[in-house]
Amino acid sequence: HPRRRLDDAERVIGEHPGLNTYQIAGMMQWKIRAKDWDDFPPGQKYFAMSETLAHLEHLLLEGRIQKEQAGDEAPVYLIK
């Protein structure tokens, strides 16, 4: 499961470079009964974003992605 999530986050970043954590989480595959990210209950979005952020940090430590931040903007992620 953790490896699948890491691969899924990396896939999203590869297909859509320059997204922030919220946007990446919204494009990942989740097993929840919601038709799309907008339909996720707020609590589930919070947990999904927390999990996504942990996976992004792991991918950063592995050197598979990079993080960029401009000023006060939310950081965005790119494939290395």
Residue ranges of predicted features:
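Long, low-complexity, charged/polar intrinsically disordered regions in eukaryotic proteins
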Residues: 1-14
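C-terminal regulatory/interaction regions
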Residues: 11-80
